[in-house]
Amino acid sequence: MILVYNRIRSIISSSLGRIHVRYNSNSQNRWLNRQLKDPYTKEAKVQNLRSRAAFKLMQIDDKYRLFSKNRTDQRILDLGYAPGAWSQVARQRSSPNSMILGVDILPCEPPHGVNSIQANILAKRTHDLIRLFFSKHFQLNRHDDLHKDHGYFQNMLEEELTHVKDTELYREIFTSDDIYETPNTNSTLIEREKFPVDVIISDMYEPWPQTTGFWNNITNQAYFRMANTSGVSIRDHYQSIDLCDAALVTAIDLLRPLGSFVCKLYTGEEENLFKKRMQAVFTNVHKFKPDASRDESKETYYIGLKKKRNVDKLDVFSNS
């Protein structure tokens, strides 16, 4: 059975009534051999981690101290979180009472102690849902099952968002741009509600174009997830820049002042411009390639520490 599977893979597209046959290639054999010999892959299985990528975040956290077990209310947002390895690390290295939300366009069962929604991080409504999830108005002692269309909790969040959208508090939190300049007793509360996240981690990457197989909501939406690198360094670089910018916009909108940020980037000619945008948002910006990253990989990680106050998206992106 294994030999037959390795020799040939048949993909049946029921909507088009066609069979696509793809033979195994030397590159697939090399990838499989590399996986079997890789020490991080083996150790991930031993530690019951969902992928070897967990060790990259561990090494980043060892150096930059993103998570804290001493903070009882740390709020962590994991972008492109499926299959959930980074969320596992965040759960292990933060306090039991910390709140962790994974966002991915694929439905994926989150690790124990982690919540998730299926959503497109490029959509403003997703930012509203994230903000609402971390707000004191959304009670987290509810049980929700994995939904075929939207993962966990999103249907509850959608209902809650509809209920609170016309309230004065919603308008104050979601539309206020002058919370720093208005000295009143509620300014700290409003700041915390508008910028509810302490740490944003992003390991997003983007897929190949899909030309067939659109047949239901899950596969249609899941396709737009940041899924597979192409192996073409120029293409991977430009796609990763777009996703890093999307993560950076999320940080501008949701990350609290002095908060921390991590994103993966494939190196290339636009890297310095992205670094400049990072420096407009964070006081300290670092570039780091963990030992768990393969030597031949073009990936690197940018870490932003101590987010600045009064960051304007237009200024950040128009000046770089």
Curated annotation (Swiss-Prot):
Binding site for S-adenosyl-L-methionine: 83-86, 104, 178-179, 203
Knockout or disruption consequences: Loses mitochondrial DNA with high frequency.
Membrane-spanning ranges: none
Domain of life: Eukaryota
Transit peptide, from-to: 1-18
Record-linked Pfam families: FtsJ (PF01728)
Keywords: Methyltransferase, Mitochondrion, rRNA processing, S-adenosyl-L-methionine, Transferase, Transit peptide
Signal peptide as annotated in the record: none
EC number: 2.1.1.168
Catalysis performed (reactions): uridine(2791) in 21S rRNA + S-adenosyl-L-methionine = 2'-O-methyluridine(2791) in 21S rRNA + S-adenosyl-L-homocysteine + H(+)
GO biological process: RNA methylation; rRNA methylation
Disulfide bonds: none
Catalytic residues, chain numbering: 264
Compartments reported by the entry: Mitochondrion
Alphabetized GO MF terms: rRNA (uridine-2'-O-)-methyltransferase activity
Known function: S-adenosyl-L-methionine-dependent 2'-O-ribose methyltransferase that catalyzes the formation of 2'-O-methyluridine at position 2791 (Um2791) in the 21S mitochondrial large subunit ribosomal RNA (mtLSU rRNA), a universally conserved modification in the peptidyl transferase domain of the mtLSU rRNA.
Recorded family membership: Belongs to the class I-like SAM-binding methyltransferase superfamily. RNA methyltransferase RlmE family.
Name of the featured protein: rRNA methyltransferase 2, mitochondrial
Native organism: Saccharomyces cerevisiae (strain ATCC 204508 / S288c)
Gene coding for it: MRM2
